[in-house]
Design a protein with these regions (language model features):
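N-terminal nucleotide-binding beta1-loop-alpha1 segment
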Residues: 1-28, 34, 38-39, 45-49
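Short hydrophobic segments within beta-strands
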Residues: 9-11, 55, 140
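Glycine-rich, phosphate-binding/catalytic loops in enzymes
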Residues: 25-26, 70-71, 154-158
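Conserved beta-loop-beta/alpha segment of the NTase-like Rossmann-fold superfamily
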Residues: 63-65, 84-175
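Residue-level signal for short, function-critical loop segments
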Residues: 12-15, 58, 143
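Short acidic, glycine/proline-enriched helix-loop-strand junctions
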Residues: 4-8, 21, 28-34, 61-96
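A general structural motif
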Residues: 3-5, 49-51, 134-135, 160-161
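Short internal beta-strands
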Residues: 51-57
Length: 175
């Protein structure tokens, strides 16, 4: 496949205010100066995603956009020892996709956000360029609590046209 593109999907569920704070649970800190959504963005970057798409409602999108931003640097391409380190960096754009109003509060769950996000990404990418059409999707849930660098050794397998699934103790999501 000549133009393989890996798109990262991060679903942010609207009804995730279970801790009682004014902000979504995806903005809860999981480490010093690191929120759950930022951890998920970094996981997508370590996995080799060329674009990252955050699927969230319009009401929480500005807060998440303010914290996360509109791009992240590919951590593999951060080379501080180059003569011009800023020239060798590879930015990864972050896009925000709102859930359609007819689906809000009716079909509002993580599974639907992933499916709706993949469909929206495909529709948008087809209209923009054939080089942006994803060959595969990498889904990162913001409520996973593990080091995002754990996917780095599998970057080549994740970024290939062949299907890939992480496992823990010999079990995958399929089990």
């Amino acid at each position: 496949m000549k133009n393989f593109h890996l798109a990262g999907i991060i679903p942010v569920h609207k009804n995730d205010f279970s801790f009682g704070f004014e902000w979504p649970d995806s903005l809860m800190p999981v480490a010093s100066r690191l929120t759950a959504i930022e951890r998920s963005v970094m996981e997508c970057a370590w996995a080799g995603c060329e674009t990252i798409w955050i699927i969230c409602n319009d009401d929480i999108s500005p807060v998440i956009r303010h914290r996360v931003g509109e791009m992240v640097q590919d951590p593999v391409w951060l080379r501080n020892m180059d003569t011009h380190p800023s020239m060798s960096r590879k930015p990864i754009p972050i896009f925000y996709v709102p859930i359609h109003p007819k689906h809000r509060d009716k079909i509002d769950c993580f599974g639907w956000s992933v499916i709706y996000g993949a469909l929206s990404i495909f529709k948008i990418a087809v209209k923009m360029s054939k080089w942006l059409v994803p060959g595969r999707y990498y889904v990162s849930f913001p409520y996973s609590v593990y080091d995002p660098k754990v996917v780095r050794p599998y970057r080549k397998e994740i970024s290939s046209p062949k299907g890939f699934c992480l496992s823990s103790d010999g079990k995958t999501i399929r089990d």
